């Protein structure tokens, strides 16, 4: 993934992690996972519920926060 993708992903995932916001993660095969984001890197997200699961980002279709979140958007990602 390019740098631009990381500029959007990282702040979004970081807010979800720091604020312990519950999330629903939908995988490309239709499976829904629920929990809290413990950690993430370039390739995986650690999702914690009763157990901790390592979910590969390429398998994720959508991440839905349990409540509205506001993320800091770097100036270079704003349209001109």
UniProtKB/Swiss-Prot annotation:
GO CC terms, sorted: cytosol
Alphabetic keyword roster: RNA-binding, Stress response
Q: Which cysteines are joined by disulfide bonds?
A: none
- Every copy of the Sm domain together lies at 10-69
The cross-references to Pfam families, in alphabetical order and at most eight, read: Hfq
**What does the record give as the function of this protein?**
RNA chaperone that binds small regulatory RNA (sRNAs) and mRNAs to facilitate mRNA translational regulation in response to envelope stress, environmental stress and changes in metabolite concentrations. Also binds with high specificity to tRNAs.
The record describes its quaternary structure and partners as: Homohexamer.
The name of this protein is: RNA-binding protein Hfq
